[in-house]
Each structure stands twice: as C-alpha cells, then as structure tokens.
Amino acid sequence: MKVHLIRKETIEAYAEKNARSKSSFKVWLTVVKFANWQTPESIKETFGAADLLGNGTNRVVFDIGGNNYRMICKYAFGKNQVHLFVCWIGTHAQYDKLCKHNEQYTVNHY
C-alpha cells in the first residue's frame, strides 16, 4: 500500500533548520513516496535500520543520515494506504535522552 505521510512539512522545516540533515531527509522522503508497505515488517524491509517500538504503540523509529538523526512516527495500516504520522524528530543524542525516560512511546511534538 502507498504511504500517506502526515506532517511532511514538519520534516521539511526540521531539515531547513538543520542544514546538515537536509539531503538525508530528502532521500528518506523520496523512498517513502515510492514505498509499498503491506505490514509493519515491510517498513523494516524498506529501511533496514528502522526499529518497530512495540508496546502496542504502532510506532517506528527511523535512523536518518547515517544514524545522526532519529525520527519517531506512528503508523496505521488502512484499507488502501498506510498512514504515517510524524511524532518527533531530533538528533541521536536527543533520542537517547527520550529513551532514558521511556518517552519514545508517547512523545508527540508535532
């Protein structure tokens, strides 16, 4: 199923503010645009370094830019498309701070 990315402008705004990340997020956006996912495991097939968070959250963490950036998204597989909601974007170090408090399961900054 095609991916319906919700909050694409959030990714673009982050990339504009963090110029070093721009090309990496552009590549990620292009891959998602042409992705065809049937199950959560399909996400991992497309992005081998992605982590499905579990705990009933339907969240995935994407490693972007050679693991310099992390993006948490919530996914919902619908009848005809996959809805992907951007929940959080930051550096790997910022992500590690979230994880210390188990906030990766609930954070919603966008």
Please give the residue ranges for each predicted region:
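Basic, Lys/Arg-enriched alpha-helical interface segments
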Residues: 1-68, 76-85, 92-110
